[in-house]
């Protein structure tokens, strides 16, 4: 099974924490999904928490589900995320490593785009390869601030 480097894991968790703080500045009902399910079901195996998070994202704001993703210039994206993270109010939040820009993309848009990208097997799992610059070219992307204003109804 593919294991991300410690540096990549820390970068992703740091980005997720930054996003939690940012959304907490603007909204009342911001939930870290893993913490939430662990409080509800404290003695479950790790797979239960992983499954919940894969379907609900990293952050939940009311009925909006957000999955935080840090992106290198050339990256891979897990097929399992394409299968599990979907719905009208599911969004990916991408932070581009090279420019430090942050964009929000509806899961439907991203999942459709990813299906056009090359499949890559890696240690028993399937991934799709893509470039960070492609995120900038998506018509349905929003900047983080614009996305927050949209949710707030401003």
Protein language model features and the residues they cover:
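Nucleic-acid endonuclease domains
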Residues: 1-154
């Amino acid at each position: 099974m593919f294991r991300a480097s410690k540096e990549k894991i820390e970068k992703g968790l740091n980005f997720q924490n930054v996003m939690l703080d940012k959304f907490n500045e603007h909204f009342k009902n911001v939930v870290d999904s893993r913490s939430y399910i662990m409080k509800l079901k404290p003695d479950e195996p790790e797979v239960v928490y992983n499954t919940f998070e894969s379907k609900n994202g990293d952050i939940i704001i009311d009925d909006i589900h957000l999955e935080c993703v840090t992106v290198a210039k050339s990256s891979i994206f897990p097929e399992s995320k394409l299968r599990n993270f979907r719905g009208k109010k599911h969004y990916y939040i991408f932070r581009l490593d090279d420019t430090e820009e942050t964009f929000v993309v509806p899961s439907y848009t991203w999942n459709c785009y990813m299906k056009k990208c090359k499949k890559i097997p890696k240690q028993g799992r399937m991934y799709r390869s893509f470039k960070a610059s492609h995120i900038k070219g998506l018509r349905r992307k929003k900047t983080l601030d614009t996305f927050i204003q949209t949710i707030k109804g401003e």
